[in-house]
């Protein structure tokens, strides 16, 4: 799948209440999680690929996982 599919549906990206606290904890951020992740998707330096049922976005030391059907941010964490 082409990453343009994710970019065309960026307005659908969201997460659940528990996802917000988990992602904030994993990344050590206090800002809006959804906007943070959308900005990483839009960043030209991000590596975006689809594997199975998920999209993966890698940017610097961060990896974000988004469900390809529902566009729910599943998790985000630092890459070690």
Language model features by range: what are they?
Residues 1-80:
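Ribonuclease/tRNase effector modules and their secretory precursors
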